[in-house]
Amino acid sequence: QLLLVVTFDAVVTSAAALLLVSAGVRFALFVPVGVALGVVPRVPDRHAVDRAWTFARWSVPDQILDRFSYNMPVFVLGVVGTPAAVGIYEAADRFADFGATISWRLSSPLLTKVSGDVAAGNGYDTYLRGAVTGGTGATFVVFGYLIGAHDVVARIAFADARWAFSTTVLLVGGVNVLRGFWTLTSHAMEGLGKPSVSFRTKLYGLVASVPITALFGAEFGAVAGAVGYGVMNLVVFGAVCHYARDVFGYVPVDAETVAHLTLGGLVAASLTASVVAVATGTPLPTPGVAAAAAVAGLGGFSAVLLAVSPPTRVAAHRVVAMVWGRGGRTP
């Protein structure tokens, strides 16, 4: 797709043209692959249609709410706020969202793994806690980095609105720890055939949070968007924990792993702040300071976990195995 877009740059000048390129590439690839694999389309029987409808009637709306919940502050601020507020929130979200994005990427393999194990009659309890908790690990190090370097990041992204940007990026980065957890847990519940539960948790979060951003977005801008985002994630987190007890019989959190990740995040924040304090007084440019702080924070975080956390190492191994194995056996 990228090659075609670059090659025909003069022709691909609209969103419609870009969508056509994407659809054309997929069609050109999927059809030959299907033929090569011997896939023969056929009309599904009534049982297959009933099963598909039972799952899709909740799964499709759930995916829509999932995307809307992620972009809710941008949508609402776009209506009640200013373009500057939208821009500040978008930029802060890009910096703070790296850890939650990794959790989101892990959620599909986790869904597949849980669904496959249940269908095969295999247990999933041995890895669920570690996979969910370990999958949120990146959010801890990102938040630790932002605690120590938010002012440097603000000077890079929005030098004219440093307070608004710093506040927004810290709120979003902090609450993404919860988002990482509930994203993975809700997908695991969906893998057990419970997409309606995942749908309801997001709906509760949106009902509680949209009015906050809508009412205060015009006055407080991006910060109101971040507060609304935080309230939404707190509500969804609480609802997911509540439903997890019914679905799994427990909340899939490894307390020891959380403690070690928290310790690693604190070390990352301390090292990041120290590097920023030292490097700011040198000729190193601001992006260089931010990069040096990131290396120090990530190094400290990794060193702590390698030194004190065997459960975290096991959890990381399971996460990697889950991603690369795509449903294969995990330890």
Regions found by a protein language model. Give the residues of each.
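Hydrophobic alpha-helical transmembrane segments
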Residues: Q1-V39, E90-A96, G221-A244, A292-V304
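Interhelical loop/hinge segments that connect adjacent transmembrane helices in multipass membrane
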Residues: A10-L19, V25, L29-Y70, K113, ...
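Interfacial/gating helices of multi-pass transporter permease domains
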Residues: A15-A16, D50-F55, S59, M72-D97, ...
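Specific pore-lining/lateral-gate transmembrane helices of multi-pass inner-membrane transport
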Residues: I88-K194, S198
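Membrane-proximal transmembrane or re-entrant/amphipathic helices at the cytosolic face
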Residues: S274-P331
